[in-house]
């Protein structure tokens, strides 16, 4: 991508030896209209304007995101191919340690892009009106929960909840999040942990109850809903996160310049507000901070997978 070319020209007017000369491609390992895709398209638009270069988004879904992840891991480390990763990036490796790539060794972290809030929701027809009542019901009767599939953030977050709350909920995996939410709304599933913005309209319409959020602080879009920490579960802090990664071996100078440019974009008020509409909080970071996050997430979820005895499909 001419990302390297464009960034370099900002300072010296000419590309260095070995600079990339192609367009920038942001690989999204999910389908369109997901959080990662929405963020990628906004970022591409801003980079187009900022760098004066062509920045395109290419969706490569499949295998829980591993097709796109592996594509970037094998790409030439010249800054022309970048990955929009999300929480699943670490979860996949925790569930399946035999992937063709290493999430730590095969990628160069650039920056955290943003975070989203997860929440625990139940059907409006289910009796509990708060977390304490829900846990009591779960301990006295057999409840279940839905998720978009084995090893997804929603699945593992609920397994973590089960461990911390000491309850046993039966897992019902669906092929898609929309299907799971539909069954939840219809009362066919007892509970779900989901990205808050996807169910907030149903909560406001009285069709679902939101019992807790997994963020560190209360969510701006639902300020009256308590965090798990406020309700006695400090370890239940889990965010959906999005990050920008490059193939391992990408020059350190390019990684730093990408970090600088993207950080400026994500701090712009118009970008912050556009992401907020989709339930994403802009949260750029140093590349070292992202590296630490990836290691922490992989360790955390590997332990959850082991304890819950979760196996790859």
Enumerate the language-model features and the residues they cover:
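An extracytoplasmic/periplasmic, membrane-proximal ligand-sensing/linker region
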Residues: 23, 163-164, 252-313
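Paired acidic/hydrophobic, glycine-rich loop segments that form the ligand-binding mouth/hinge
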Residues: 79-85, 144, 190-194, 209-212, ...
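Bacterial N-terminal signal peptides
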Residues: 2-13
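Short hydrophobic alpha-helices and adjacent helix-cap/hinge residues
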Residues: 7, 18-22, 46-50, 124-136, ...
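A ligand-binding cleft/hinge motif common to bilobed small-molecule-binding domains
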Residues: 89-98, 155, 160-164, 191-225
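N-terminal (or domain-start) structured segment
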Residues: 18-105, 142, 150, 166-190, ...
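Hinge/capping helix and adjacent helix->loop/strand transition within the periplasmic-binding protein
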Residues: 74-79, 94-179, 228, 241-274
């Amino acid at each position: 991508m001419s990302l390297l070319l464009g960034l370099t020209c900002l300072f010296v007017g000419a590309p260095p030896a070995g600079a990339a000369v192609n367009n920038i491609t942001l690989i999204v390992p999910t389908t369109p209209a997901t959080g990662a895709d929405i963020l990628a398209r906004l970022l591409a638009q801003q980079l187009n304007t900022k760098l004066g270069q062509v920045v395109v988004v290419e969706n490569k879904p499949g295998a829980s995101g591993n097709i796109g992840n592996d594509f970037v891991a094998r790409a030439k480390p010249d800054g022309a191919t970048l990955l929009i990763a999300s929480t699943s990036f670490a979860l996949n490796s925790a569930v399946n340690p035999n992937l063709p790539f290493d999430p730590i060794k095969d990628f160069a972290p650039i920056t955290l892009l943003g975070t989203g809030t997860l929440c625990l929701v139940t059907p409006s027809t289910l009796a509990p009106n708060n977390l304490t009542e829900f846990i009591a019901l779960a301990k006295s009767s057999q409840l279940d929960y839905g998720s978009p599939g084995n090893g997804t953030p929603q699945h593992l977050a609920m397994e973590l909840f089960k461990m911390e709350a000491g309850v046993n909920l039966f897992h019902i995996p669906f092929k898609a999040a929309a299907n799971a939410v539909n069954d939840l709304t219809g009362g066919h599933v007892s509970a779900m942990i989901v990205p808050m913005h996807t169910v907030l309209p149903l909560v406001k319409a009285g069709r679902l109850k939101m019992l807790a959020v997994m963020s560190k602080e209360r969510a701006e879009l639902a300020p009256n809903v308590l965090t798990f920490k406020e309700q006695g579960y400090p370890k239940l802090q889990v965010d959906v996160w999005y990050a920008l990664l490059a193939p391992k071996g990408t020059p350190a100078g390019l990684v730093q310049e990408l970090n600088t440019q993207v950080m400026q974009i994500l701090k712009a008020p118009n970008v912050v507000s556009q992401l907020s509409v989709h339930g994403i909080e802009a949260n750029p970071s140093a590349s070292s901070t992202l590296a630490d996050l990836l290691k922490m997430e992989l360790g955390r979820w590997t332990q959850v997978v082991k304890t819950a005895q979760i196996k790859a499909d």
